[in-house]
Each structure stands twice: as C-alpha cells, then as structure tokens.
C-alpha cells in the first residue's frame, strides 16, 4: 500500500476546557476523495485548519508527505503550502481583485512570472473549471454563487497541487449547480490524479464523489468506505445515513 499523503496521529484540539478532538487518528490515501462529516460542534473546520497548518493543535502530529507540519517554522510551512490547494466555504475571493487577479495571486507569491505567462495560466485554469474567459475581468460581486465556487477552485489549482482541500464546496448552491460542481470535482480528480479532502454536510455530494468517509463523533473519528460507514452502529451515523433526508439523497444518486 502507498504511504498516506496525510497522517494525523493522536490529534488533540481544545479551546480552554472544551476538548474538541481527543486522540484523533486519520490517514488520507493517495488518489482518494475523502469526505469529512460530523454534527455541529464536532470540529470539522478545526480539523481542516489543523491539517492546513493554520492552527497548532494542543497535541499530536499532522504529517504531510512524512513531514510534521505542527513543528515547522513559517518558512518551512510555506514550502509545504504550495503543494496543496484549498477552497473555503464562501469562496474567500478577495473582493477588490478581479477573478484573474485572484487566480494569479498564489502564482505571484511563489514565482516571478511574466504577465504573458500569468494570463496564459489564468485562461487555462478558467477553462479547467468551466468558467467563460470573460469572467477573468469580473469582480467577485459580479459573479453568481456557482461562479464564485468555480473561481475559488481555479485559484486553488493555480500551482498545480496534488492535494486539494474543499470546505463545504456545494454550500449555498441550488441542486442543479451543486450536482454540476460535483461532476467538476470528479472530472478534475480523475484528470489531474488529485487527492481530495472534502468537508461537506451535503449527502448528495458525499455519495456522488467520495471513496471513503471520516465521521467526527464523540471527540474521535470513525473512517471507512461508504458501505462500511453506513453500517456503523453509532446512533448519529445511523440517523445521518439512514434518516429521511439520507434515503432521499441515496435514491437521487441511484436514479
């Protein structure tokens, strides 16, 4: 078996006396799409921020390609960050920058690229995520919700990462736009051979895109294939995957 792209070992996160994660272990395998789910307050975003190196845990390790990012300096961490792309729940595009300028920002941070190269890379990324080329000169305020998600994805792909983090990628989208974004993620995952870590509450997205699922529950984590996790006896997992909304989602994916 290939070495994990990410290994989380004995992770502890707490805020004051509130323990969010208590000894969490998680491996992200090369080439998979791993979905992370959990109820409110289980620390999905905290786990993501810790894996991104944006938050230092109270204990444990986060190894990316064998290197523990929890003990890195900011300079060392910067070299790791160029290897992954990330989209946040609401896009997090800079409102005063055009779509092109947002996409070019990480490239400018790491490389001294010519304007011609920047424009060519911008056009390529726009095509990759299915945005029209005239979107390049628009501000985020001029875009629809679905276009903002795609522009954020284009920026996340700017440095050709092998690892992609998606935080609630379909949140706020109508069902048609969400299904279209799911298909885009599958297409990019296959075509670019990406490893994807996705936080989502959207069962349709989970069922349509993920190979494995990690459930944050009781300060721990349960990880399995979709089929395996759906048979887990924990009451929250059973309600999540077999409640009325879950049955409707499974029926829509099967049809």
Indicate where each model-derived feature is located.
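The feature captures the beta-strand-to-loop junction immediately N-terminal to the Walker
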Residues: 37-39
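Conserved catalytic motifs of ABC-family nucleotide-binding domains
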Residues: 160
């Amino acid at each position: 078996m290939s070495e994990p792209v990410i290994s989380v070992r004995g992770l502890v996160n707490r805020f004051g006396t509130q323990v969010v994660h208590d000894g969490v272990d998680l491996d992200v395998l090369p080439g998979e799409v791993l979905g992370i789910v959990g109820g409110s307050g289980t620390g999905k975003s905290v786990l993501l921020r810790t894996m991104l190196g944006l938050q230092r845990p109270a204990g444990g390790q986060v190894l990316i390609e064998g290197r523990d990012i929890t003990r890195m300096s900011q300079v060392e961490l910067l070299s790791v960050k160029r290897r992954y792309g990330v989209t946040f729940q609401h896009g997090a595009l800079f409102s005063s920058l055009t779509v092109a300028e947002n996409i070019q920002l990480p490239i400018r941070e790491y490389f001294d690229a010519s304007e011609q190269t920047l424009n060519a890379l911008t056009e390529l990324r726009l095509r990759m995520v299915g945005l029209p080329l005239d979107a390049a000169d628009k501000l985020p305020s001029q875009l629809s919700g679905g276009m903002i998600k795609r522009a954020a994805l284009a920026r996340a792909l700017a440095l050709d990462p092998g690892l992609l983090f998606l935080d609630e990628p379909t949140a706020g989208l109508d069902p048609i736009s969400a299904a279209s974004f799911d298909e885009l993620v599958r297409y990019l995952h296959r075509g670019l051979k990406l490893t994807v870590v996705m936080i989502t509450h959207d069962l349709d997205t989970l069922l349509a895109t993920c190979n494995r699922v990690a459930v944050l529950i009781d300060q721990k984590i349960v990880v399995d294939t979709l089929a395996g996790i759906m048979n887990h006896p924990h009451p929250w997992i059973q309600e999540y995957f077999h409640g009325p909304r879950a049955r409707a989602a499974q029926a829509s994916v099967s049809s």
